[in-house]
């Protein structure tokens, strides 16, 4: 037997399963499983990516100054307190790598994003799951779960896969209730879908224990390029830059992301279209007897009567070329997460769910 063994915790990591993209036997599908922007990226981002092709022989920027400057301008932030990564996943990994080790604990909520647990285990730490209250983050449960070994607390707000969120006062109470030496990480992957929401800016700028993360994979439609960023206290960003590789983002990704964030009109179009069809989708599902919590993201968590009904509906949809997401791995076996698609995709989804309910009656 081999004596080559991984570090403790590594083999406790379940392989991440992304949303399916294909259905065997079908050439065309409607993919509503990965919370992607159905409108795609800004035309300006596509043009910038193409233009970057002439520089493929050059190493990319090491400090991401152009992208950090654009983010700072659009969001009203200090560019020196921004760090960029290959998706917000990498920022999450940096945080665990830098602040978590054997014996340390990291808190995440019951239905929180899977990468919190994965990155914690990869760093040798212990993930601690705390309950939610009816699929909503419970600040009191988090504070009750904190020990002298807690180093990070991850909150997705809005949360994936539930779509629920808590307000600024609750977040401030959480930040103030954490002990010294513990960072609160606000994952704002879906924050751009919430009007007039800073996703943590005020908390970051008024406290030394709060970091916020964002992604270009959702409203900006750049999931294939893997770009994310974080904003935090100077001392935290300095630490994260010490573990960040010097060329972690490609020239094309940097160019496309900068163009995307500057195209505010296109972003607003995407936000408005999502709000319109998200409301329509939730209403139509409710009329079919399928409830969902109020979503602040670009998906709806459809709740069925049982895991069996959810599974049967998933199979029914797949047979018709519509792919949604089972979320049993998030301890929601009786639910399906349905990305808000374009008009055609949403109508096709509702028609198929209606047909499923009719044949099951």
Curated annotation (Swiss-Prot):
SUPFAM superfamilies from the UniProt entry: PLP-dependent transferases
Cofactor: pyridoxal 5'-phosphate
One GO biological process term: L-histidine biosynthetic process
Protein name: Histidinol-phosphate aminotransferase
PANTHER family from the UniProt entry: HISTIDINOL-PHOSPHATE AMINOTRANSFERASE, HISTIDINOL-PHOSPHATE AMINOTRANSFERASE 2
Pfam families, alphabetized: Aminotran_1_2 (PF00155)
Catalytic activity: L-histidinol phosphate + 2-oxoglutarate = 3-(imidazol-4-yl)-2-oxopropyl phosphate + L-glutamate
Modified residues (N6-(pyridoxal phosphate)lysine): 218
A GO MF term: histidinol-phosphate transaminase activity
Record text on subunit structure and interactions: Homodimer.
Record EC number: 2.6.1.9
Organism of this sequence: Dinoroseobacter shibae (strain DSM 16493 / NCIMB 14021 / DFL 12)
Pathway membership: Amino-acid biosynthesis; L-histidine biosynthesis; L-histidine from 5-phospho-alpha-D-ribose 1-diphosphate: step 7/9
Keywords: Amino-acid biosynthesis, Aminotransferase, Histidine biosynthesis, Pyridoxal phosphate, Transferase
Family of this protein: Belongs to the class-II pyridoxal-phosphate-dependent aminotransferase family. Histidinol-phosphate aminotransferase subfamily.
């Amino acid at each position: 037997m081999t004596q080559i063994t991984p570090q403790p915790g590594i083999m406790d990591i379940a392989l991440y399963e992304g949303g399916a993209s294909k259905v065997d036997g079908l050439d065309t599908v409607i993919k509503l499983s990965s919370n992607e922007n159905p409108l795609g990226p800004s035309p300006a981002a596509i043009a910038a990516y193409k233009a970057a092709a002439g520089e493929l022989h050059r190493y990319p920027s090491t400090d991401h100054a152009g992208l950090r400057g654009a983010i700072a301008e659009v969001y009203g932030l200090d560019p020196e307190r921004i760090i960029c990564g290959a998706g917000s996943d990498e920022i999450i990994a940096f945080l665990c790598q830098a602040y978590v080790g054997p014996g340390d604990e990291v808190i995440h909520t019951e239905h929180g994003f899977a990468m919190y647990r994965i990155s914690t285990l990869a760093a040798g730490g212990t993930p601690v799951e705390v309950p939610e209250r009816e699929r909503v983050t419970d600040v009191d449960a988090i504070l009750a779960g904190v020990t002298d070994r807690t180093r990070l607390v991850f909150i997705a707000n809005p949360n994936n896969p539930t779509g629920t969120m808590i307000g600024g006062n609750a977040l401030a109470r959480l930040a103030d209730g954490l002990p010294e030496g513990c960072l609160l990480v606000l994952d704002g992957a879906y924050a751009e879908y919430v009007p007039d929401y800073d996703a943590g800016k005020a908390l970051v700028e008024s406290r030394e224990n709060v970091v916020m993360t964002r992604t270009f994979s959702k409203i900006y439609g750049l999931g294939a390029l893997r770009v994310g960023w974080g904003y935090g206290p100077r001392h935290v960003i300095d630490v994260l830059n010490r573990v960040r590789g010097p060329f972690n983002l490609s020239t094309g990704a940097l160019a496309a992301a900068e163009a995307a964030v500057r195209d505010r009109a296109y972003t607003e179009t995407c936000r408005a279209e999502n709000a319109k069809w998200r409301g329509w989708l939730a209403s139509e599902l409710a009329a079919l007897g399928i409830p969902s919590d109020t979503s602040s993201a670009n998906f709806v968590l459809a709740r069925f009567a049982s895991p069996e009904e959810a599974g049967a509906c998933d199979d029914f949809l797949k047979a018709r070329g519509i792919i949604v997401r089972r979320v049993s791995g998030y301890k929601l076996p009786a639910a399906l997460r349905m990305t808000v698609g374009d008009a055609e995709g949403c109508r096709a989804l509702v028609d198929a769910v209606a047909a499923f309910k009719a044949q099951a009656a």
